[in-house]
Amino acid sequence: MASILALDGLYAEVPKFLPEALREGCAGKNPLSFYIQQILNLMGCDGNEYHVLFTGSSEEANTHMIMAAVRRHLLRTQQRPHVIIGAAEPPSVTECVKALAQEKRCVYTIIPLKNFEIDPVAVYDAIQSNTCLACISGTNAVVKTFNKLQDISKVLKGIPLHSEVSELVYQGCIKQNPPADSFSINSLYGFLGVGVLGMKKKVMQGLGPLIFGGGLRGGSPNIPGIHAMYRTLTQQRPSMKKINTIHKLFMKTLKKHQHVYLPIGGVSAEDTSAENISTKDIPVEGPKELPGYILFSVGRRAEELQKKIFTKFNIKVGRIVDLQEILFRIKIPQKYWETLLFIQLRDNLTKEDIKRVMVVLMHLDTITPRGSLPPPSYSSSFS
């Protein structure tokens, strides 16, 4: 995806240990119970409290949980079940809930973002007498900020909370942000075809047969893929933490300079001199519905990028700005532009690319004068 707000392209580099891990898994040295216990330990979960099912992906795990919760409610009551979902949830959550709603099997409420997060108070206000499930991811899928799962769980007061927590797990932040009732994890590398659905046993009441099939779930576990997922969880975290550092630093820098990089109403690129800009024309924040959300674009790809990103994350508010104009406005030396464009346009980044990006971000954060604008004589370069 071509967006600096989603650095998923950084995750695409397959580690050297992965083929070896797959071969180790094929040898079948460890039973399935070993991987269940180890993955729960890595998440800081008590193995005695959780039931775990390995699935084909987190998408399958999400669908299992939603379908089971809705069916359990329909079997118990005459009311149509109500599901709460957060804005920017994975498509496997939103599409499943919307499909059930179209078939009149449930109704749903989407909780909007507040400062890139799901507000627990908004979740509380959305609760109805027929609410059977809340689906709130551990991180915002757009900008990777953490949602307060424990606070959300408290306001739900017994209503199950299901979370997609892959980002938290691979960044090593899951112990500080543990899932509340049930969770799903996806393999870091999609071709392994492995996902995890875990849930507290107290939530299992009435859900077990609907999800686990009474022990009759077809097929055998993908042990090689599960072993590789376990190895990835234990070895990939240092690079994931570095990626998370890059992202946080970039977001911090964007917020620091947002009064400079946000579009200025009624002022063209040729008129962006300090003499021609009135203070009242410079916005101090982005659109109220989604503060500071910026989609960087280059040339004619702007509309295409907006459509892809806004459609995928169900976002209807945002701004497109010219990347080159921003780089010049905050006086980023031209030798760094190529590196920043890597974040924008390339799907796969190497370790060297990451190092170069870190250099640029440190330059942005420590050297760049706050609010600096280009002199008039250079403005025409970006028209």
UniProtKB/Swiss-Prot annotation:
InterPro entries the UniProt entry points to: Aminotrans_V_dom (IPR000192), PyrdxlP-dep_Trfase (IPR015424), PyrdxlP-dep_Trfase_major (IPR015421)
UniProt entry tagged with the keyword Zinc: no
Induction, as annotated: Expressed in the late phase of the viral replicative cycle.
Highest taxon of the lineage: Viruses
Cofactor: pyridoxal 5'-phosphate
Binding site for pyridoxal 5'-phosphate: S58, E59, S184, I185, N186
UniProt KW keywords: Late protein, Pyridoxal phosphate, Virion
Cellular compartments annotated: Virion
Entry keyword annotation includes Ribonucleoprotein: no
An annotated GO cellular component: virion component
Family designation: Belongs to the class-V pyridoxal-phosphate-dependent aminotransferase family. NifS/IscS subfamily.
Protein name, per record: NifS-like protein
Originating species: African swine fever virus (strain Badajoz 1971 Vero-adapted) (Ba71V)
